[in-house]
Amino acid sequence: MSVEDSIISIDSLQDQGINAGDINKLKSAGICSITSVLSTTRRNLTKIKGLSEIKVEKIKEAAGKIKKYGFLPATIVAESRTKVFHITTGSKQFDEILGGGIQSMSITEVFGEFRCGKTQLCHTLCVAAQLPTDMGGGEGRVAYIDTEGTFRPDRIRSIAERYGVDADICLENISYARALNSEHQIELVEQLGNELAEGTFRLLIVDSIMACFRVDYSGRGELNERQQKLNQHLSNLTRVAEDYNIAVFLTNQVQSDPGASALFAAADGRKPVGGHVLAHASATRILLRKGRGEERVAKLQDSPNMPEKECVYVIGEGGIKDTD
């Protein structure tokens, strides 16, 4: 079954007696699949203009008839996991420690200091996600949310040349947005629903996840509000990954903390920003750091199915690759 086949369109609610006007209201809020309806709380659905509690209850009931969303035999869960795919990082050693590459249906986070390859990895994945599956790709499009203005089309062209693909087509398949602030960043993810429901996207990149939040919420007095907003944002990203079977890839910054625990910090005491909220949302967590000379080191710190391990990679004209 293809990814497109696994997404049940929200338009199927019409067969259950829900009128087209109410369906369009859901779409305008970025809710474009039956799974999205089921995973959105009644409270949040009633916040959509024009949807009363009675209407929301009918919509929930109709969605529940189309797709069962309670206890299921584990065999069905196992079957759904067969749809998971991996996108190559460009390095065989890097892919190996990840169990095949960047995984769909979950969030992968990389964090590290300046010039360790976070954005270069994003650019490599933009091309890799479009490659055929036999080349480690996802044969699909990419959504790219840039919070720091570091996206460079010229890098995409260089990486496309490495893989022998048309650079213009590659760029055409990348849906790019520059996030202006944390509110805009949240809205961009919410607006993606209509495009993702088409089933042609394989990867969503946010580079970087915390940059706008750190600017908009700067003092300790605003930390609680920041973490609440971040939690909601990450919940939406998790839902996107699971509902549309795409890989969500986040880059993150680091900060110094000499008293940080080994779980969250690197050997030099630096830890990723975002706290426990981000740590729990990321299924896979990777630390990137500088190695000897031009070498970079990737350490898998947290994964639901792979042990802690590290590898060495380099950044070349064609993106991330193995050392010679």
UniProtKB/Swiss-Prot annotation:
Keywords: ATP-binding, Cell cycle, DNA-binding, Meiosis, Nucleotide-binding, Nucleus. GO terms for cellular component: condensed nuclear chromosome. InterPro entries: AAA+_ATPase, Dmc1, DNA_recomb/repair_Rad51_C, DNA_recomb/repair_RecA-like, DNA_repair_Rad51/TF_NusA_a-hlx, P-loop_NTPase, RecA_ATP-bd, RecA_monomer-monomer_interface. DsDNA binds at R214, R220, R226. It is found in: Nucleus. Pfam families: HHH_5 (PF14520), Rad51 (PF08423). ATP binds at G112, E113, F114, R115, C116, G117, K118, T119. GO terms for molecular function: ATP binding; ATP hydrolysis activity; ATP-dependent DNA damage sensor activity; ATPase inhibitor activity; DNA strand exchange activity; double-stranded DNA binding; single-stranded DNA binding. PROSITE patterns: RECA_2 (PS50162), RECA_3 (PS50163). Disulfide bonds: none annotated. It comes from the Eukaryota. One of its GO terms (biological process) is synaptonemal complex assembly. SsDNA binds at R214, Y217, R220, R226, R296. Belongs to the RecA family. DMC1 subfamily. Required for meiotic recombination, synaptonemal complex formation and cell cycle progression. Double stacked ring-shaped homooctamer. NCBIfam families: PRK04301.1, recomb_DMC1. This is Meiotic recombination protein DLH1.
